[in-house]
């Protein structure tokens, strides 16, 4: 498990993904670590969730989110929330070079399938303020 939630509060994570199986795995893994995890199946819900939370500490977006692709969602949310930590889950076969050209430079790419351990490490690192560089997330 990742380190306990620091300081004064709960860490809030929004997961934007339409794959129910993947979402269940991600939510279960992150909740085991004490995080509060919200889920959005579509772009509108993701934008509303991030905007309505007192604080959103991390957005994890998949390749496919109903209404727009994950890259589009990230670009849209980054415009209104420039400091929001964001991770991208890739499962669509696009090359790293292609994704890196479309994503902000501080958005790491976590390729599916991935283990609970890799997800935990990525989340812990990003929640602690140490953003991995863009491209593949390397432990």
Walk through the language-model features, giving the residues of each.
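Non-catalytic signal-transmission and effector/linker regions of two-component phosphorelay proteins
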Residues: 1-27, 33, 75-79, 83, ...
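Short alpha-helical
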Residues: 21, 45, 68, 94, ...
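Conserved beta-strand scaffold positions in the cores of enzyme catalytic domains, especially
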Residues: 37-39, 86, 109
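Acidic, metal-coordinating helix/loop segments flanking the phosphotransfer/catalytic sites
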Residues: 39-58, 62
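His-Asp phosphorelay/catalytic-motif detector in bacterial-type signaling
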Residues: 55-57, 80-87, 111
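Conserved phosphotransfer microenvironments
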Residues: 56, 61-75, 93-96
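Hydrophobic/aromatic residues positioned on beta-strands within the core alpha/beta folds
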Residues: 89-91
């Amino acid at each position: 498990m990742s380190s306990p939630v620091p300081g004064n509060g709960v860490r809030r994570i929004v997961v934007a993904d339409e794959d129910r199986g993947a979402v269940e795995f991600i939510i279960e893994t992150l909740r085991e670590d004490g995080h509060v995890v919200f889920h959005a199946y579509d772009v509108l819900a993701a934008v509303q969730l991030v905007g309505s939370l007192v604080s959103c500490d991390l957005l994890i977006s998949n390749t496919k989110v109903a209404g727009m692709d994950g890259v589009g969602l990230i670009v849209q949310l980054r415009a209104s929330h420039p400091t929001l930590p964001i991770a991208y889950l890739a499962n669509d076969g696009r090359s790293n070079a292609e994704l890196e050209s479309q994503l902000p430079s501080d958005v790491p790419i976590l390729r599916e399938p991935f283990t609970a351990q890799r997800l935990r490490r990525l989340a812990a690192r990003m929640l602690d303020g140490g953003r991995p560089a863009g491209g593949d997330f390397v432990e």
